[in-house]
A protein has these predicted regions:
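Terminal-appendage/accessory-domain detector
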Residues: 4-21, 28-268
Length: 268
């Protein structure tokens, strides 16, 4: 359900917060003795039968017999972190743009054009999306790549009512074209690759390919990257307390108690 992209509606950004809210609410209700259906998945009127004419409930527990002894099958070990504040399908191109901007010396005005090559499934979602709202801008491949080339990042502050009207970024986005390539299609979904080519007015050109976006298990993610992502999200609300929260969480071998966190967050 991606129809929100057609008009830049706000619904998608509510989804993860609502999921976290519902998980916390379920735990609180259970702690007070609230009950739910004991066979919600496999029951005759459960989720599987509601969603499929041929449900296979055994797949829920297949290969779990030796799970405790096999850390390699725990999916949490293969979670990707979203380093950039845009659609995940844009991240390889954003990483490529940042790599080129970091490795070479040129001004935004020096850029003649930028070509992005990407896998087809990405354009199924991103093609035609215009940065008409801050949320829609996160799904605009030209806007995201232009932002990355200009600022060498794609933080939340790059997607505001003001930045989506910034003529320098928009003019650069107009120079960016994109297309699909079969060799990149063949890599997806094991990899989410992109190829970025930047040509300057003087004829110089730079090209790079990113197979795995920053934050993927194959690339790892550094503590500093995670900390910087937290700062960019939390600073408008916690201001200078962000580093205190990072220190409390990162310098522990165990999770801090909720009271410890609220004490830090509550003192501005």
């Amino acid at each position: 359900l991606w129809e929100f992209l057609s008009d830049g509606a706000m619904s998608k950004q509510l989804h993860p917060a609502k999921a976290a809210h519902d998980g916390a609410l379920a735990a609180l209700l259970a702690s007070e003795g609230f009950t739910g259906a004991s066979h919600i998945f496999e029951g005759k009127k459960g989720i599987l039968n509601a969603m499929s004419r041929d449900p296979r409930p055994n797949m829920l527990t297949d290969n779990l017999e030796h799970l405790a002894e096999r850390s390699d099958v725990w999916k949490i070990n293969f979670v990707s972190f979203k380093v950039h504040s845009s659609c995940r399908h844009t991240h390889a191109a954003v990483d490529g743009a940042i790599r080129i901007a970091d490795s070479n010396s040129f001004e935004i005005a020096d850029i003649a054009d930028v070509k992005i090559e990407i896998y087809s499934q990405a354009l199924d979602l991103l093609d035609g999306v215009e940065p008409v709202t801050p949320w829609a801008a996160k799904f605009s491949l030209p806007f995201c790549v232009a932002t990355a080339l200009r600022y060498k990042d794609c933080t939340p502050s790059r997607f505001t009512e003001e930045t989506i009207l910034d003529q320098t970024t928009l003019a650069l986005a107009e120079k960016i074209s994109f297309d699909t390539k079969e060799d990149l299609d063949s890599m997806y979904p094991a990899a989410w690759p992109s190829r970025v080519m930047v040509r300057l007015q003087n004829g110089a050109s730079y090209e790079t390919q990113v197979d795995y976006p920053a934050g993927d298990p194959e690339t790892d993610v550094t503590t500093e990257q995670l900390s910087e992502k937290f700062r960019s999200l939390a600073y408008p609300y916690l201001e200078h307390n962000t580093d205190s929260v990072i220190e409390l969480v990162m310098q522990r071998t165990y999770a801090p108690k909720a009271r410890e966190l609220t004490d830090v967050i509550g003192h501005k």
